[in-house]
Amino acid sequence: MRYCTIPPVHSPIIRLQHGILSKMKLIYFSNEFPPDDLHTLFRELHNHSKDRRHPILARFLEEATLAVREEVRRLPAHLRALIPPFESIWNFADFADLRKGQLCGSIDGILLCSVELGTLIRYYENNPDAFNLETGGTILAGLGIGLLATAAVSLASTVADLPITGAQVIRQAFRLGILVDEVSQNLQPRDATDTSTPDSWAYVLPNVSASEVQQELDTMQGIVKTPEASKIFISALSATAVTISGPPARLQAMFRTSQFFHDHKSVALPVYGGLCHAKHIYTVEDVHHIVRTSSMALLDSKFSPQLPIHSTSTGAPFPAVNATELFEHIIGEILMRAIQWDKVIQGVAQLAQDVGATRCEIVVFRNSLPIHDLAAALKTIPGLETSTQEIIPWVHSKPPAGEGGPRGPLQSKIAIVGMSCRMPGGATDTEKFWELLESGLDVHRKIPADRFDVDSHYDPAGKRLNASHTPYGCFIDEPGLFDAPFFNMSPREAQQTDPMQRLALVTAYEALERAGYVANRTAATDLHRIGTFYGQASDDYREVNSAQEISTYFIPGGCRAFGPGRINYFFKFSGPSYSIDTACSSSLATIQTACAALWNGDVDTAVAGGTNVLTNSDAFAGLSHGHFLSKTPNACKTWDCNADGYCRADAVGSIVMKRLEDAEADNDNILGVILAAATNHSAEAISITHPHAGHQAYLGKLVANRAGIDPLDVGFVEMHGTGTQAGDAEEIQSVTNAYAPTTRRRTAKNPLYIGAVKSNVGHSEAAAGVTAMLKVLLMFQKNAIPPHVGIKTGLNPIFPNDLDKRQVRIPYERTEWPHVPGKKRVAVVNNFSAAGGNTTILLEEGPVQEATETDPRSTHVVAVSAKSKISLKGNIERILAYLEQHPDASLANLSYSTTARRYHHNHRVAIAASGIAQVKKQLQSALDSVDSHKPIPTTGAPPVAFTFTGQGASYKSYNLELFSSSPYFRSQILHLDAIAQGQGFASFLPVIDGSHQRDHQHSQVMTQLALVCTEIAIAKYWGSLGVKPDVVIGHSLGEYAALHIAGVLSASDTIFLVGQRAALLEKKCKVGSHNMVAVRASLAQIEASAGKYPYEIACINGPKETVLSGPTTEMDAIIPVLEGDGHKCYRLEVAFAFHSAQTDPILDGFEALANSGVLFQAPQIPVISPLLCKVIFDDKSVNARYVRRATREPVNFLSALEIARDIGIVDDETAWIEIGPHPVCVGFIKSTLSPVNVAVPSLRRGDDNYTTMAQSLAALHCAGVKVEWSEFHRPFEAALRLLDLPTYAWNDKTYWIQYIGDWALTKGNTFYDKEKGLNSAPAALPTPKSSISTSTVHQIIQESIDGEAGTVVMQSDLMQADFRAAAWGHKMNQCGVVTSSVHADIAYTLGEYLYKKLKPKSKQVHMNIANLEVLKGLIANKNPESHQLIQVSVTTSDIGSNTAELTWYNVHADGTVDEPFASATLIYGDPSEWLSSWIPMTHLVQGRIHELERLAESGVANRFNHQMAYLLFANSLVDYAAKYRGMQSVVLHELEAFADVVLSTESGGRWTVPPYFIDSVAHLAGFVLNVSDAMDTQNNFCITPGWRSMRLARPLVAGGRYRSYVKMIPTAEDPSVYLGDVYVLQDGVVVGMVGGIQFRRYPRILLSRFFSAPDDAHAPPVATSTSSKHAVATPATKGVNGVKAVKAAPAVNGTNGVKTVPAVNGTNGVKATPAVNGVKPAPPVEVEVNSDTTTAKAIQIIAAESGLDLADLTDDSSFADLGVDSLMSLVIAEKFRADLGVVVGGSLFLEYPTIGDLRSWLEEYYS
């Protein structure tokens, strides 16, 4: 008897049946894993794959891995996130949890197929002759997934084909598992919280018949009316057993309730991935979905079935003629047909008889029961000898010793996808760098002052010890600029961190930003798979700058290993980080190392580069003495005949690299492609520093060979080209020999261009390689070669004289280098090390990338974000500028680039627009409102609530763009529609697919199913975008979708309930007999208006939103009544009056259906019930009775929301999303729960779906909801390109420790002792250059007069008697403080002196001292025997301009000067003009004085006499000596006053304008602010940093009588800053004015910090002062006498000798529990304060100073959120010192940003 149909003649079985065969072979693939340890099997297969004898096995594992990677990339984000990083498919064997979860079917499928096919390949590679399968009469059989594996063998003609065919099997297995899981979860959702072994979907029952089982199933499922899709069915049968399958819960229920199944033995099978062999669930479309891929089409073109595979349902071979048909047969078999192994046995036995076989070899992996049965049947055939061969043991076998070996490195092309730089010459980005190169600039300059004093450290004669022989270099502008807060660094840490590290961090961010990097967006950007690699060859900043102030961050901020480590730490990369030093080749060697990591699979993305910032004069001196450096003023004179060494340079560059296939899959911009890289050593050179042409040429050829590139195809070589005679000559020889040899001549059409970037920007040493790499990448991008500018005089004469013949060309001007279609431009970068190493990298241009499709979306989201308002403004401005420069920019690409391909920070702007013009308009509007912009909280994303719309918002037919263009949404709809059709309902697709007009009416079953299924699909679509609900609420019909999304109902049961209910309504209720009317009124208002009319309340939607139901006649009667009272009414377009008596006829039947066939489960997220007006958490509340009541009873949406709010399920921060075809519920939510953070619709009637989605996504994004933007763009990514947008706009400030003095010259030697006068008596002051000498200007030490320009420098000793008396006559905090009037006298003296020097004939000189700014208070030493020198310079470039600039400095003991502590501008003027300009103000001032007189007479203003005024002033702040006490009386009202002044007649001192005269007429302003009862003088004091102008039109004379007037007002920008104008009157005329005098208010507790003598060892740490001009974080340098620099928090470490406890990372504070599923967390633990510990007292101080309750200071409270700013930080720090003895600085709260962090630190060190 035959058990198969006659196959077509082209089937492979025909070939087997023609003729008699003596031997048959059957290869059997099981559906069970071998009993061997799976990890061991894969590990041994992996080890075999490394052996060169098993290239096919290796290729199979590689191809299988690539196939899985490709399928993983296509997964939705929520599934992709489940898969850990993997290097090879065999890694999945280690993912135990994954094999239990949602992807278990896919993972086990690929593992089983991999181990079986890998084992088979390993077996046949060892026995290649045995794979002559066709002539050997081979047939194939398998079970389950094993049947799928047979396809690989059937299609393969040779073993070498198996990697390709096997990879397709792996792909199909993975796709099959995904589909099976997705479909099965609609039948019974998996419990995501259960991590134990899942329940089985299949049980085997031995010793029963299939008919018995089917009869019992029919009976039981008929009783409970189980939906068709959820029914249990027979999935496999044999003579001795039957296997049944179905949803696990239903199987378990069946075994509990059925006596038949209870009485029979059953065994659960390890089937956890879902249902197969289910013809009632799956369709041919499902088969096509799995099989028909682009890779399958490729397989069809190369392979066709060679061997027969026996069907497990018929026993006959599959009649397939190509790969697609074969896989469709097999997938269809697995999905839709029951297994009947007996038929396979019969079919094989029949075949053996038909061909007359005498021997049959059965090849198995391990023996099993099906093979036992098959072998037993074959043995009954007469004359047939049967044997079984297990091949798993071959996996465990070891190769004989001495055989095999490594297979070789895996070579991929490496794509460079991002770049950034900081280069000399102002090249702060790659575009400016190209402009520099293209312009042919040489950007050398003298060593700038921020590095070291070039004059003292440079000696061209080479005689001075440790001095440089050259004063030149190429330098980055302002290398200290850095956005410390962005990178989570305190000012102190930033200041002490090497600028190389900082700029590496910045350029890494910019390069990643340009690469479109977003963490974990793709497999290649998984944080575990990213590493950093940076070259650095020196630690200048640590050795020189920060070594002057060694503190906490000296090691991590200065040691080079921390550079790449810091990048990894900031970005949270957990791949490797390397800092590599190979001298001048460091960065290119590092890039090669990064390539190796990519080639080896150690990382999937690499960030690499190099850094060099020069601050150490030692290196200049050492390289000078080593004869490396040129002494001439130029960058490197590369290839010049007079080349004499190189010019040192700064540079920082970063690039981002990926394997090319990953970059293309990630849709990256590919700037260039590295084909090969290698390093060798010039071992045979004459010295370690000397190059060797032979080794260099060998390396060049080696790299070309590895890349598979003809050396003649190289079009450009970027040479090392340092400009040394030896280096240039050796390199040109090596380059010409490698790429332009004499043996193979280049043609004129194929020249070799050479260049060297060092001729533009110098030799940046460790960064030279990446600098050269960036140049080449820019050449690819710009299609041009920039001019070479190194040849200043003539070409090096020792160069080969046949360069022209070899077609080697030097581009002396910009040369076009265009892209040629069909041919890649190829370039080489050379980088050599002074230590002997040579590194060469060969690159080609990136592939041309063009969009292959069109994005159909009409509206797009554009997002801009930053970490600060300043940067947000800058980022918006940059985008606007980009759009101006690129008017043709694609909006779709802009959206994709700013959303899916950028990091999103807490200051956000997102807009939805349909055109670039709209984008510009909206961004401009956002720009104008940046200052009022509020950032999203940093505490985490807000909870999300889904609200599901009822039928009242639906419309008859809708054309969903999502259905047509979103594969994910479409797949969800199709799966749900298939379930509906499987349950006997008509397809609802016509309602949503656009096939009908919007007003086309469908049946109620179709309409209601369409609504609910659309809402389910929308909710899941939101989930695919990463937006998942923490709580749900459904309105009326929408509640069914809500219950499904919450996990209460399966999709199958949801469809069953909705469809059956609609069918009952159609059957038992009359359409149109009843109506529903929405009324804009409350229940009370309706009752008051229409209480006597009959109606039913259907919905209570909001405070004034109510829906009535009832018969149409009753509704017709009530509407005019309600509208007559002003209540707007409108009828809902619904067929039936839900929630009214009209539904009564269906209630019993509906409840019965729900009771019999539906499983209600506990919700996985809270459900807000409008029926029960409560939040449901349990598995009892929702049942058949519930759905009955929900049909009939009112929807109390209002009360449900209020209850949810009251118990904390939702709050003001909740983000609401309406799930439905048109928004209705969001209006109810806003009116009920106002204020609402954000409430948005999913779809809107009349609007394109993507317009609504874009608007909603933009709003959610700005509210802080995390959106998976990549998933939003994924269906359209083929149409999208990443734009090269401007990089982040940094909020930079300067962080820099200046090298002070010349200790780098003098260290450890006596060479300079004589020069400095050391080891002898203290040096006298420098010899005076002039005889001028006053009490404040002691001697002129420098004088330079050149025509109209001039400079005068003076030095004075503050300890000289008159000067010291002037300082101590102005005491603050018992310290002598140099008042601004002293600075004014100095200014008048020097200004007059300089003016008369330049204009000797001038007699009287009048000056306006403008813009005086005192950055640091000048405080006198207590010891008068000491010296305390200051230096002041005055300079003018043109006295004709009538201006000069003044600068004040402190002078150190070694004669060096500090940073300037004060500055001013002198403006020479005409006093008559001043007097005239003040005339209009005189009567106003006099009027105010008269008003103050009147207020004083009436007792409103205060009048103080001379003694009382100065007593109050002394008690408040300043204790003046008698000479300064000129005010005879003061009248004061609030912040306004006038004083009568008589100047002292006491003589003494030599002054230009005596300071006590100036102070007497001007210090009224300080008196007002420090004495007035309008100020809190008990807790605060005010001091001045300067004024805008000081003009005295008449001289101040001893004994002169004056009147001063001032009114101080707080500034709008900063209420702690006060401004005013002091008017000086004489005889009723304004004769002088101090304009724009400024005071700042400080807490009094800081007085000691601000004003302590420099030589006081017991002084507290010096605090910071104020400036309106200098950047916040500009650090002070050491040795400052007085107040340190502007707003920079004082250093915590050892200021003024006070030892402090070292800081630790503040990361161990207690954090608040985040909200889960929308439920608010319990209140954070309050800080313990009821103890006498230092910690408790510290917390109490913080509470007192910040004005907060102790309850507010929870461990998770951040100081920034509590309002602890830099000033309050100083106050609290001073309180800690004074009250607790805890010495800290104001930066403490930057380093320990939360209460918990600070508490942990205090407890560690002070408890």
Swiss-Prot record:
Multidomain protein; including a starter unit:ACP transacylase (SAT) that selects the starter unit; a ketosynthase (KS) that catalyzes repeated decarboxylative condensation to elongate the polyketide backbone; a malonyl-CoA:ACP transacylase (MAT) that selects and transfers the extender unit malonyl-CoA; a product template (PT) domain that controls the immediate cyclization regioselectivity of the reactive polyketide backbone; and an acyl-carrier protein (ACP) that serves as the tether of the growing and completed polyketide via its phosphopantetheinyl arm. This is Atrochrysone carboxylic acid synthase Agnpks1. Residues 1338-1473 are annotated as: N-terminal hotdog fold. Residues 1338-1648 form the PKS/mFAS DH domain. Keywords: Multifunctional enzyme, Phosphopantetheine, Phosphoprotein, Transferase. The modification O-(pantetheine 4'-phosphoryl)serine is found at S1766. Residues 41-173 are annotated as: N-terminal acylcarrier protein transacylase domain (SAT). Pfam families: Acyl_transf_1 (PF00698), CurL-like_PKS_C (PF22621), ketoacyl-synt (PF00109), Ketoacyl-synt_C (PF02801), PP-binding (PF00550), SAT (PF16073). Non-reducing polyketide synthase; part of the gene cluster that mediates the biosynthesis of agnestins, dihydroxy-xanthone metabolites. The pathway begins with the assembly and cyclization of atrochrysone thioester by the non-reducing polyketide synthase Agnpks1. The atrochrysone carboxyl ACP thioesterase AgnL7 then breaks the thioester bond and releases the atrochrysone carboxylic acid as the first enzyme-free intermediate. It comes from the Eukaryota. It catalyses: holo-[ACP] + 8 malonyl-CoA + 8 H(+) = atrochrysone carboxyl-[ACP] + 8 CO2 + 8 CoA + 2 H2O. It comes from Paecilomyces divaricatus (Penicillium divaricatum). One of its GO terms (molecular function) is phosphopantetheine binding. The keyword Phosphoprotein applies. The keyword Membrane does not apply. Pathway: Secondary metabolite biosynthesis. Its EC number is 2.3.1.-.
